[in-house]
């Protein structure tokens, strides 16, 4: 039976084009369920990149260890296999004796990397138990984002988290990348209330997907299909 709006007008059911499934109308909460992940609606037309659909901006969030970076790297692998130029920054943990001792920041295009967070370096900027080398973050990460915004087909940012937002130049580079007319993938700290993260979550032009231990192997393929315009 069709539902009716407050004005008495029947609301049509929505049909999933691929599977032929009928979805009943739901309250407009700004998110849709797609298998195991929630996806924010994308209402605006944007520029297309050859080999892809709309120039989507997708934020991947999740609990620590859920697989945000793993998911992002799998998407990058598939995009590059399709001949797309991916640029931006990636962070890598430094693990010694099964203990996380810090993080590298890496320019994905050039593979240049430096330690930017560590228990061992001296810095006035501390986040938790790590000292933050702002200059290393900016010389590698921020420059990578600027280059990707200008030259890459797809921009990647891993991650927008508590340590990275200590750099005003990083914050501005993320904003510039978000405003660029290019596809963008970024990983987001799940719980931080930093103003930049809050702004990203509120943006109408960013889809937020949550990775979990259950969907981490499937989600990269869904993201690529979203970026190619094969699913809505």
Where are these regions (language model features)?
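Hydrophobic anchor at the beta1->P-loop junction of P-loop NTPases
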Residues: 60
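The conserved Walker
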Residues: 64
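Conserved lysine of the Walker
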Residues: 68
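Hydrophobic positions on the alpha1 helix immediately C-terminal to the Walker A/P-loop
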Residues: 71
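N-terminal phosphate/diphosphate-binding loop that engages ATP/GTP or pyrophosphate donors
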Residues: 77-127
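Phosphate-binding/switch loop-helix module in NTP-utilizing enzymes
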Residues: 124-169, 175
């Amino acid at each position: 039976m069709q539902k009716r709006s407050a004005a008495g007008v029947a609301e049509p059911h929505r049909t999933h084009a691929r599977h032929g499934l009928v979805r009943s109308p739901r309250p407009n909460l700004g998110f849709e369920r797609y298998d195991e992940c929630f996806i924010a609606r994308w209402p605006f037309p944007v520029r297309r990149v050859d080999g892809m659909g709309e120039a989507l901006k997708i934020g991947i969030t999740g609990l620590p260890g859920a697989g945000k970076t793993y998911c992002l790297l799998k998407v990058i692998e598939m995009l590059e296999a399709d001949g797309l130029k991916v640029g931006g920054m990636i962070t890598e943990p430094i693990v010694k004796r099964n203990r996380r001792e810090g993080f590298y920041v890496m320019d994905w295009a050039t593979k240049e990397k430096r330690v930017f967070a560590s228990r061992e370096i001296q810095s006035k900027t501390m986040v938790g138990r790590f000292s933050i080398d702002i200059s290393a973050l900016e010389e590698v990460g921020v420059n990578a984002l600027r280059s990707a915004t200008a030259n890459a087909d797809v921009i990647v940012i891993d991650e927008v988290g508590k340590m990275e937002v200590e750099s005003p130049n990083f914050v501005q580079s993320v904003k510039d990348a978000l405003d660029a007319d290019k596809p963008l993938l970024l990983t987001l700290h799940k719980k931080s209330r930093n103003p930049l993260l809050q702004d990203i979550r509120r943006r109408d032009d960013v889809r937020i997907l949550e990775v979990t231990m259950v969907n981490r192997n499937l989600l990269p393929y869904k993201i690529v299909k979203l970026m190619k315009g094969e699913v809505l």
